[in-house]
Swiss-Prot record:
The gene is flpA. Keywords: Methyltransferase, RNA-binding, rRNA processing, Transferase, tRNA processing. GO terms for molecular function: histone H2AQ104 methyltransferase activity; RNA binding; rRNA methyltransferase activity. Its EC number is 2.1.1.-. This is Fibrillarin-like rRNA/tRNA 2'-O-methyltransferase. Interacts with nop5. Component of box C/D small ribonucleoprotein (sRNP) particles that contain rpl7ae, FlpA and nop5, plus a guide RNA. The keyword Iron does not apply. It comes from Methanosarcina mazei (strain ATCC BAA-159 / DSM 3647 / Goe1 / Go1 / JCM 11833 / OCM 88). PROSITE patterns: FIBRILLARIN (PS00566). Involved in pre-rRNA and tRNA processing. Utilizes the methyl donor S-adenosyl-L-methionine to catalyze the site-specific 2'-hydroxyl methylation of ribose moieties in rRNA and tRNA. Site specificity is provided by a guide RNA that base pairs with the substrate. Methylation occurs at a characteristic distance from the sequence involved in base pairing with the guide RNA. S-adenosyl-L-methionine binds at T82, T83, E100, F101, D125, A126, D145, V146, A147, Q148. Belongs to the methyltransferase superfamily. Fibrillarin family.
Length: 227
């Protein structure tokens, strides 16, 4: 019998031969990206590969993930939905507003969204939040995984527009999308400084950790707007 350990609300460690990060499948019997399904006492868990998910890596790097069953989430950089599907599992009674700029990725993503009533796909540029302001309500959490040079600016624009006063920003900073020559550590230091000082009202950075060994040259950041 597999062993289940809850790491935080909606996030589990399932041990069957080995420990595997998992979420409770909101769409039983269906897989999204080739993950394993594990049944335990009538519940079905989907394994969550941290090497294919920045948020999954942040869980294993001991971030205090603030997602709840009824959370409203704005996900920037949805791609084809690998991580969005796990967020959908976690916020089973909430909503995941999922922004993706690439039409090809969105075509793949639409199939996933059609099976999960809490996913709302939005084909848009995450750098232009006003273009989807008529769709997105105030959210509890913003998760951002976009490979653009102005990652901090995009996060700030969306947080000011949509994040509740007591909400949280979870951000994956990809150093090589900002500067291919500079030291990743220097890039991370500068991007955190931008979050804290370059935008009004600015962010209070709560946690910042590199996502190795799961993702090279990536920094995970958890922050909230300054009060």
């Amino acid at each position: 019998m597999p062993e289940i350990r809850q790491l935080s609300e909606g996030i589990f460690e399932v041990t069957k031969d080995k420990k595997q990060l998992s979420t409770l499948n909101l769409d039983p019997g269906k897989v999204v990206y080739g993950e394993k399904l594990i049944s335990v006492e009538g519940d079905e868990y989907r394994t969550w590969d941290p090497r294919r998910s920045k948020l999954g890596a942040m869980v294993l790097k001991k971030f205090d993930i603030p997602l709840k069953r009824n959370s409203k989430v704005l996900y920037l950089g949805a791609a084809s939905g690998t991580t969005v599907s796990h967020v959908s599992d976690i916020v089973s009674e909430g909503a995941v507003y999922s922004v993706e700029f690439a039409p090809r990725s969105m075509r793949d993503f639409i199939g996933l969204a059609s099976r999960r009533k809490n996913i709302f796909p939005i084909l848009a540029d995450a750098g232009k939040p006003d273009s989807y302001a008529h769709i997105v309500e105030p959210v509890d959490v913003i998760f951002q995984d976009v490979a653009q040079p102005n990652q901090a600016e995009i996060a700030a624009r969306n947080a000011v527009r949509f994040l509740k006063k007591d909400g949280y920003l979870l951000l994956s900073i990809k150093a090589r999308s900002i500067d291919t020559a500079a030291s990743p550590k220097e890039i991370f230091k500068e991007e955190v400084k931008k979050l804290e000082q370059a935008f009004e009202p600015g962010f209070e950075v709560l946690t910042a950790r590199e996502l190795m060994p799961y993702h090279e040259d990536h920094l995970g950041v958890m922050a909230r707007l300054k009060k």
